[in-house]
Amino acid sequence: MKHYTVQEIADKMGLKTLCCRSGLQKTVKGGYVSDLLSDVMGNAKEGEIWITLQSHMNVIAIASLKELSAVVLVKDIHPGDAVIAKAEEEGIPVLVAAGPAFETVGKIYDILNN
């Protein structure tokens, strides 16, 4: 598996960056997709990029606690201003993909494995 920065993945996929440009140089070591917060808590690994449709404050808290590289929100979902402010404070880049989770995960997988 190749390692890319969050910025490189965002550029290759045309993702919108909503916040935390300072975190865009983090290395992405893999990916994790889930909308169940307890699943992410138990199974996501440091340095992974988290793909989800959840856009509330707890997503940022878990991403920070698990030391994830970034959060990618699917289906063009945009979180509220308070979530963006918390992500900025925690140094967690929040990106937005227009497509559904299945398509987004497939593209990230292809980038990391080809």
Regions found by a protein language model. Give the residues of each.
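N-terminal, charge-rich interaction modules
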Residues: 1-21
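The Walker A/P-loop phosphate-binding site
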Residues: 31
